[in-house]
From Swiss-Prot:
Subunit field text: Homodimer.
Active site per database record: D52 (nucleophile)
Signal peptide positions on this chain: none
Residues annotated as binding substrate: Y110
Gene3D superfamilies tied to this protein: Pseudouridine synthase I, catalytic domain, C-terminal subdomain, Pseudouridine synthase I, catalytic domain, N-terminal subdomain
Function: Formation of pseudouridine at positions 38, 39 and 40 in the anticodon stem and loop of transfer RNAs.
Keywords, alphabetical: Isomerase, tRNA processing
Organism: Paraburkholderia phytofirmans (strain DSM 17436 / LMG 22146 / PsJN) (Burkholderia phytofirmans)
Enzyme Commission (EC) number: 5.4.99.12
Designated gene of the protein: truA
Name recorded for this polypeptide: tRNA pseudouridine synthase A
Annotated InterPro entries: PsdUridine_synth_cat_dom_sf (IPR020103), PsdUridine_synth_TruA (IPR001406), PsdUridine_synth_TruA_a/b_dom (IPR020097), PsdUridine_synth_TruA_C (IPR020095), TruA/RsuA/RluB/E/F_N (IPR020094)
Length: 270
């Protein structure tokens, strides 16, 4: 039995999230259907992060076990030939038995793309969030600093969250403006259900002047979901990358086709 890892990208706007659900259109169902067609045998995948309805994947990682012997490029091209245009396998790689797409990961990174303009753009529908009033980027970055470190993030956790503990370690939040867009980057060991969208709701409240910077610390300390801002829209949220130990040599996400990806790649080079 061989263990194969895949890097998967998808436009999540047409799907009811990642996880398979009866009578619902999900990314997992489409991927496993395509793998079954290509492999001519049922394939069950394990995913790094279960994204919600409308959330996109740039650097999603899955693994599955199979007795089939196929070249890496065959897994990519063969599976893609049975996938819709909104999902694509980017790479395939044999892995040792100890590799696990979810439990071997030590961090996840999400991007949020926010369009700030008086009028919404239909060209960005489902690809970016939108607010019609200007935002104070400096205030949002200062507010984000209150969240860094290991905390109980119950105030940013949905009622449907199944995580065993609300304690997570948030390593990094970056906020950067580029023209009519504000870009956010969140990096943590793991995230709770709706956590990034709930963080976004609070950051936008602060950026829009509806709450002071210090309010973020009060929300965190409250551990009360009702004390925080409403859950923000999913449209601009992307699972950007999943971090693994170097021993697994997991390929980096192929994000060159995403124009705004230069926001963070250029920053890394400076």
């Amino acid at each position: 039995m061989k263990r194969i890892a895949l890097g998967v990208q998808y436009d999540g706007s047409a799907f009811c999230g990642w996880q398979s659900q009866p009578h619902r259109n999900t990314v997992q169902d489409e991927l496993e259907r395509a793998l079954r067609e290509f492999a001519r045998t049922p394939v069950q995948t394990v995913v790094a992060g279960r994204t919600d309805t409308g959330v996109h994947g740039l650097g999603q990682v899955v693994h599955f076990d199979t007795e089939l012997d196929r070249a890496d490029v065959s897994w990519v091209r063969g599976t893609n030939s049975f996938l819709p245009k909104t999902i694509s396998v980017q790479w395939a790689k044999p892995m040792p038995d100890e590799f696990h797409a979810r439990f071997s990961a030590f961090e996840r990174t999400y991007y949020y793309v926010l369009y700030v303009h008086p009028v919404r753009s239909p060209m960005l529908a489902t690809r970016a969030g939108w607010v019609h009033t200007s935002l104070d980027v400096d205030a949002m970055q200062k507010a984000a600093a209150h969240l860094l470190g290991e905390h109980d993030f119950s105030a940013f956790r949905s009622s449907q969250c199944q995580a065993k503990t609300p304690v997570k370690h948030l390593y990094q939040i970056d906020v950067k403006q580029q023209g009519d867009f504000v870009h956010f980057r969140f990096r943590a060991n793991a995230f709770l259900h709706h956590m990034v969208r709930n963080l976004m709701g609070c950051l936008v409240y602060i950026g829009g002047g509806r709450r002071p910077v210090e309010w973020m610390a009060e929300v965190l300390a409250s551990r009360d979901r009702d004390f925080a801002a409403p859950t923000f829209m999913p449209d601009g949220l992307y699972l950007a990358q999943v971090g693994y130990p170097e021993q697994f040599a997991v390929p980096a996400p192929q994000t060159g086709s995403v124009p705004w990806n230069t926001v963070w790649t250029e920053q890394a080079q400076t």
